[in-house]
């Protein structure tokens, strides 16, 4: 991590086909992460595919003051949450189509996560994108990170679609 922290990430999926629903977990700490179990009470959740919210409680265990970021549209139906929980619905796939030409909203979602939580700095995210991509892919992904960040920043400032 560029911010002096230790991340540990791992997926959890069954013996299913490519594209099937799955969970991924990330632990971040100021010390090396030794715990290797699933996360049952997350501080934050990011829902990349909102169709997973049908028939599955994606918000199960989200902490009292937790934050959820959902790749979706403003008019989507949201579950009832606890008073201090926040949900940001970000049109990440639309941002990605406009910036990189493909509906892969991951970089827009990580920008949104940075703005919603303060856990990551935008400048550091941009540096990571610069190291990971080159050419037009780099330019598009930098723009996607910025737009995801700005979308949530504006929602926090102006009370736009924030539930």
PLM ranges: what are they?
Residues 1-163:
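Active-site cofactor/cluster-binding pocket
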């Amino acid at each position: 991590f560029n911010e002096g922290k230790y991340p540990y990430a791992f997926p959890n999926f069954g013996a299913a086909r490519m594209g099937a629903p799955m969970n991924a977990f990330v632990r971040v700490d100021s010390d090396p992460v030794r715990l290797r179990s699933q996360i049952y009470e997350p501080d934050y959740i990011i829902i990349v595919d909102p169709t997973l919210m049908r028939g599955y409680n994606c918000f199960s265990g989200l902490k009292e003051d937790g934050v959820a970021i959902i790749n979706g549209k403003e008019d989507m139906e949201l579950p009832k949450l606890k008073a201090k929980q926040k949900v940001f619905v970000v049109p990440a796939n639309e941002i990605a189509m406009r910036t990189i030409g493909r509906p892969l909203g991951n970089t827009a979602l990580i920008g949104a996560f940075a703005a919603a939580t303060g856990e990551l700095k935008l400048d550091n995210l941009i540096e990571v994108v610069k190291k990971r991509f080159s050419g037009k892919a780099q330019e598009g992904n930098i723009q996607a990170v910025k737009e995801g960040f700005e979308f949530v920043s504006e929602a926090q400032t102006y009370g736009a679609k924030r539930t």
